[in-house]
Amino acid sequence: MANIKANEKSYRQNQKANLLTKGFKTSLKNQLKKTKASKDKKDVEQVYSLADKLAKNNRISKNKARRLKSRAARWSNSATAASR
């Protein structure tokens, strides 16, 4: 543990941020699984929204958000193409 007060505070802040980030990433992963299984347009929109929010707050990189959105769109498009 840190010996300096500022370092102790920094440690607490990092712990809190890590906990938040972990929760957000878990929710994104669960939404991706749901989208891949259902391939519903509403689920894809939720992936878009969640990925954009996380990228905006630097919880994930902007490139990762773009990649995830692209994958979700491909899953949705392949489902609509298969149903034709």
Curated annotation (Swiss-Prot):
Keywords from the UniProt entry: Ribonucleoprotein, Ribosomal protein, RNA-binding, rRNA-binding
A Pfam family annotated for this UniProt entry: Ribosomal_S20p
Example of a GO biological process term: translation
Classification via InterPro entries: Ribosomal_bS20, Ribosomal_bS20_sf
Bias kind Basic residues: ranges: 62-72
One term of GO molecular function: rRNA binding
An example Gene Ontology CC term for this record: ribonucleoprotein complex
Location of the region described as Disordered in the Swiss-Prot/TrEMBL record: 62-84
Compositionally biased intervals (Polar residues): 75-84
HAMAP family noted in UniProt: Ribosomal_bS20
Summary of the function given for this chain in its UniProt record: Binds directly to 16S ribosomal RNA.
Protein family (similarity comment): Belongs to the bacterial ribosomal protein bS20 family.
Protein name: Small ribosomal subunit protein bS20
Organism: Mycoplasmoides gallisepticum (strain R(low / passage 15 / clone 2))
